[in-house]
């Protein structure tokens, strides 16, 4: 329908959790059709892991869509959370790094490039999906960003760290002190840092 109506690149599939339960033959036909239509994808890993397969006996369905295959096909895949502190997902915080963390585990996306792609799924990819202009760190962009207490994107997903600064249009609008951990054992005072340098 997307191609027939000339809407290529303007349609987004949210959740797509049914793809988790589709047989491989059907998906082998569906994904190329999605590529042809330039469909964008928003997976909701935390909600889908909690809600899908809830009433299954074993084996239980994971429920998250086929993120690895969709990314490999070149589709723009983003992660989100659509249920925050509600009856469906009372533990969701709205933190997209939680969504990326869950996706890494649920989707077996543990290769370094895959984990970096998961970080892009909560940063660059959603901006592209929304058609945001002036997004990014290039000269002339809007300077809307969040400074994390992490050395790289993989550490950001692993730690879900302190947001040191939230910057909007080049102005700091929120900030938090750096997280520090102190170890105080008899005769061995020390501090530890979970962030790799």
Regions found by a protein language model. Give the residues of each.
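Glycine/Thr-rich phosphate-binding loops of Rossmann-like dinucleotide-binding domains
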Residues: 21-22, 50-51, 113, 156, ...
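Residues at alpha-helix caps and immediate loop-helix transition turns in enzyme cores, especially N-
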Residues: 26-27, 92, 159
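Active-site microenvironment of metallo-dependent hydrolases
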Residues: 116-197
